[in-house]
Amino acid sequence: MKIFQIQCSSFKESRWQKSKCDNCLKFHIDINNNSKTSNTDTDFDANTNINSNINSNINSNININNSGNNNKNSNNIEITENIDNKAKIINKHIKTITNSKPIPIPIPTPTPISIKEKEKEKEKEKEKEKEKEKEKEKEMKSTINLRSEDTTSNKSTIVFTECLEYKGHQWRPNICVTCFSPKNKHKNVLPETSTPLISQSSQTSTITPSSSSTSTSTSSISTHKTANNKTVITYISSTTTTTTTSSSSSSPPSSSIAGITNPTSRSSSPILKSVPPSAYSNVVIPINNINNSNSNSSSGGGNNNNKSISTPSSPIISRPITNKINNNNNNNQPQLHYNQPQSSSVSTTSSPIIRPVLRRQFQSFPSNPKISKAILEQCNIINNNSNSNNSNNKDPVILCKYTIESQPKSNISVLKPTLVEFINQPDSKDDESSVKSPPLPVESQPIFNSKQSATMDGITTHKSVSITISTSTSPSSTTTTTSTTTSIIAEEPSSPILPTASPSSSSSSIITTATASTIPMSPSLPSIPFHEFETMESSTTTTLLSENNGGGGGSSCNDNSRRNSLNILPLRLKSFSFSAPQSDSMIEQPEDDPFFDFEDLSDDDDSNDNDDEELKEINGEKIIQQNDLTPTTTITSTTTILQSPTLEKTLSTTTTTTIPSPSTNSRSICNTLMDSTDSINNTNTNTNTNTNTNTNTNTNTNTNTNTNANINNKVSTTTTTTTTKRRSLKMDQFKEKEDEWDQGVDLTSFLKRKPTLQRDFSYCNNKVMEISSVKEEAKRLHGGTGYIHQFAFEAFKDILEAKQTQINRAFCSQKIDAPDCEMLINEINTAKKLLEDLLELNSNSSGSGNNSNDNSGSSSPSSSKTNTLNQQSICIKSEI
């Protein structure tokens, strides 16, 4: 079947396919009206057909163009040549005549396939699939029948639909491992009451228990002081006996089942044999040997055969355990008696069904800690009048008994952690002469015996034993742990049993026990016994107190010494400033004083002296020249204490002494007249100011005034204490780092504006501003006073040198360019020239001033020396 193509008026090359028209999306007809390619052909076929006809088409196109003038009524052919660089394909396009019509393309009629044939083919495919499934089911049934004949006699019809056998996942037991489908969709899952697929009838075992026991004993002692300066001794001894019973297997011929474990219980391994819990339900433990250490302790006619036992429930055991007391004194070791169900041997014919074990059922990691409280069970108060050597120390001794639940050491990984909490503390305000016992708990009331008491030197000791029995079972062994705890707390005065220091000083005593173990005691009460040591044999309380009474020469140590050694002492900085009496020569040359502009630090001018002389001549003897009465000596002591890097305390003391001039001695008349007007000649003022600039301001001022009838001197002392919060000095431009820019502004404000500033312009601009500020300050000083002091000139010069070093560093680190560096150095040089010019003006003015002063009879060198002597240097020293 041949498909005709439609001709279009103009050919437009497609972007993606060079041989296709973009208007009609088809391959066009050549000059000979032969179709090059069909619409179904690929671009490769079209290109090959076009390439084969290139030469013939070019020749025919040339002939048509030459004869185009003669045949005007014929078809006008427009040839467009598009040459591709890679394929070099030339596509010819024919322009149709305007009166011509497009050639219609006949639509082919496809030969339809009958629907019935398609349905038949589908049915055949389905039948083939069903046959394959049936073959697979037959194979699966054959394998299952073979297994069922070999393993079990009770055959059950099992049909498998998905996998051969169901295997539960370890973490998700309801999902099969092989097909990952739920358990409900499997038909091969056996019920729980039926026998397993793989039986172990041939492997039978009989458990014969074999026991082994270990015992450990620990004791601890601790003391603390109450509010009434009473010493409380806590003595806790713990004896732990662990009995482990393991099973050895044998294979008797009989296959009787005495006990079968619960199939619903999950086990981690199918090989281990499980033991019914009824076999270990009753545990009998003798108590006589456990309490042998306590039999010799009571000396007051007590009955030692009556022992008390308390069995609090263990948090590990889920089944109840019945405890019995065996008073047989012939048994030296703990014994275990088992109640055998129906037969003497316990055997299992098959292992339980393999079940996955969930993570939450493992006990390898301990759960949340369980708080076992130390319950106060008995408390007795004994008078201490017989042993008291001092009349002041007659405090009673309080004996308290606590019961603490202890955990065995063998199953630390299985048992829960235990925290001890002291409750029901004895009241220190009880009457000294009476003996009080608080109400006992319901569980521990039958534990105590009133006859278990002994008196020695006015002290009564009480003993009781608390036994905790815990049992943990496993498929192969059973561990029974018996923990015996004896706890005694005795409160006694600090003297004469325990030598302690005075109540005002905090000290810790040392107690020496029978095992030569030295324990430093802490004055504070801990929540858990903090000093714990193991002993060869548990010593009794009576022996402990007697040894402490006789040889308790304890030493004391000061806790504050170690604490103070760790503290960092504050840094003290002291500065002193001294001002000598001023002479008349200083007034003649005020230009040498750098603080001439300040009125409070300068004396009167010569014009004022002339006015005083005129007033003296007018008023006679009633007016005294002011310069003769104002020579003063001022000593300023400033102490700065840096208590912390952010806290600063300043203590300032100023002492001012006013001494009359010697010229006033010749004017005794004037002095006698002024005595009536002067009421206070000696004044001492102490001002203490505490200021905290952080949040609040507290000011405390204390002023002390003393009046003495002293005519010749006036002394005033002022002390000021100021506590301020230390801040930065904001002088970052003088301590520039190599990796940071020196912007010459406040660091905080610069960091806020840093992203918006340009790199080079900001640096150069700030440096120019700093140099110009030095120029302006120098001009201001010279314009106001007419001179610049030499110290100010040196300070300005040092600042300019520092700026020059900073600019050199910036140039070396490539922060600024060479022209910028030259520009900044030129600015510094202009500032230096300005300072030198101002200094020359100062020298000229000082030379003219010296000439005038020489004519008046005064010497400038002497005045300069007195000026340097009057302004003393500042001494700074640190004290730690």
From Swiss-Prot:
Residues 589-613 have a biased composition (Acidic residues). Residues 193-223, 240-256, 294-332, 536-548, 844-864 have a biased composition (Low complexity). Signal peptide: none annotated. Residues 101-149, 191-224, 240-273, 294-350, 425-446, 470-508, 536-561, 580-613, 682-713, 844-880 are annotated as: Disordered. Residues 115-149 have a biased composition (Basic and acidic residues). Keywords: Coiled coil. Residues 257-271, 333-342, 865-880 have a biased composition (Polar residues). Residues 113-147 form a coiled coil. This is Uncharacterized protein DDB_G0281025.
